[in-house]
């Protein structure tokens, strides 16, 4: 899996919440308590949803200026 390089040394909690045919994936950066959520079809698979949640967390942390 291609984890964004800026997140490699950060502690991130990932949770999955299935809701019918959709799964909500939440990623939270432990140090800053920044949390993001995405949703996708159950058929996408856990790894795909995890990667997309990590990419979104990376984007949000960069936008806030927390990471570069």
Residue locations for each model-derived region?
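Negatively charged, low-complexity tracts enriched in Asp/Glu with abundant Ser/Thr
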Residues: 1-9
């Amino acid at each position: 899996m291609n984890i964004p390089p800026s997140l490699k040394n950060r502690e991130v909690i990932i949770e999955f919440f299935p809701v019918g045919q959709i799964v909500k994936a939440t990623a939270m950066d432990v140090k800053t308590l920044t949390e993001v959520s995405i949703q996708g079809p159950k058929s996408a698979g856990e790894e795909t949803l995890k990667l997309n949640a990590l990419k979104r967390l990376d984007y949000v942390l960069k936008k806030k200026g927390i990471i570069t």
